């Protein structure tokens, strides 16, 4: 857990983002020949938003899905190289104390995560067993060991697709390649992630797969970037029963700033805060955090066209506006600190 020593090491309040796709942009820029992307572009932007800690995920884009291991290692190599080149402002961390030390040095701390694990079923020399294969479950640990040496602290079994581990939240109309929900392989991987102390993230899983994770792991889980389905009825958001279960297990729900998960008509800053209020009313403020999922630096369409400029939350520079509005809505400084970093550090300290 985050103890008083760790708390005392943090000089000021800061914001932790439970979900960032920055690694994707870093990889694309480096492929074009750019270097020190964090130092030149992202560190100043993150500081402007008060964000000093985040989970930086490796996400294999759909166009690379048939060669996931290769793309995953490209993303990992790009991220590690850029962090090394930008070491004056950013550092990979693996626990709460390391993050606190990094912040004290004036740097930004990155926890390494993976957004989807299709790569594990395609890993070289790893073929899914057709019959009893005692060596199979030992071989699948190889990619986890490779990532573990790089500092992996977080994992999602799938993105929106269905793979050989689980069903994604957007795979309901796709051809079924395995039975709906967690597969036996997915259950084994889930148990191994838990054994290694890696944060298991149920964002992007469909309801049946979330149920499977809950059956396999009787401990803390997170939903890094998901909202309340009751307020915005899309499959990517969480049902009330899953929100309650995450809270019961001591986890956190990171509220997502992606417009389509906030409201279908008015995805405003205040509606974002409504999701915070809704989840906090059900499981307590100690189990809510920020998982912004900002994509303004990627080639995406503008999704905030229905919101007035002062009601937008679409880039990291908008985070101070969110904090001010939380104060105006009646949140205390202690509550805002819990949302911003205290809850996340507590959970990461449990793993």
Tell what function each PLM region has.
Residues 178-214, 223-225:
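Loop-centered beta-sheet repeat module
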Residues 214-227, 307-312:
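A short alpha/beta connector and helix-capping loop motif
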Residues 200, 216, 246-248:
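Short gly/pro-enriched beta-turn/loop segments at secondary-structure junctions
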Residues 1-176, 229, 233-351:
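N-terminal hydrophobic targeting/anchoring segments and the immediately downstream early-domain regions
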Residues 191, 218-219, 245:
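Secondary-structure boundary/capping motif
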């Amino acid at each position: 857990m985050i103890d008083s020593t760790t708390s005392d090491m943090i000089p000021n309040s800061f914001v932790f983002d439970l979900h960032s796709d920055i690694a994707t942009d870093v990889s694309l820029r480096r492929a074009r020949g750019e270097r020190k992307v964090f130092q030149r572009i992202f560190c100043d932007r993150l500081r402007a938003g008060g964000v000093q800690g985040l989970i930086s995920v490796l996400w294999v884009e759909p166009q690379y899905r048939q060669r996931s291991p290769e793309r995953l290692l490209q993303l990992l190599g790009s991220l590690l190289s850029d962090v090394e080149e930008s070491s004056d402002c950013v550092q990979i961390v693996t626990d709460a104390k390391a993050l606190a030390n990094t912040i004290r040095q004036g740097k930004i701390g990155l926890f390494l995560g993976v957004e989807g694990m299709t790569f594990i079923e395609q890993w070289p020399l790893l073929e899914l067993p057709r019959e009893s294969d005692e060596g199979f479950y030992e071989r699948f640990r190889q990619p986890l060991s490779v990532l573990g040496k790089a500092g992996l602290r977080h994992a999602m079994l799938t993105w929106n697709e269905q793979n050989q581990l689980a069903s994604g939240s957007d795979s309901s109309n796709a051809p079924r390649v395995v039975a709906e929900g967690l597969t036996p392989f997915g259950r084994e991987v889930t148990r191994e992630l838990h054994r290694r102390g890696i944060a298991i993230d149920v964002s992007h899983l469909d309801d049946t797969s979330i149920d499977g994770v809950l059956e396999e792991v009787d401990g803390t889980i997170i939903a890094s970037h998901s909202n309340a389905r009751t307020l915005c009825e899309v499959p990517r958001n969480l049902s009330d029963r899953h929100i309650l279960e995450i809270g019961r297990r001591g986890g956190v729900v990171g509220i997502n700033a992606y417009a389509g998960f906030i409201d279908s008509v008015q995805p405003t800053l205040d509606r974002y805060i409504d999701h915070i209020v809704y989840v906090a009313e059900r499981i307590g403020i100690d189990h809510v955090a920020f998982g912004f999922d900002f994509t303004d630096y990627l080639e995406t369409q503008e999704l905030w066209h229905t919101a007035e400029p002062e009601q937008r939350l679409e880039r990291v520079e908008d985070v101070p506006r969110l904090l001010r509005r939380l104060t105006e809505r009646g949140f205390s400084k202690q509550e805002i600190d819990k949302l911003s970093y205290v809850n996340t550090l507590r959970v990461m300290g449990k793993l």
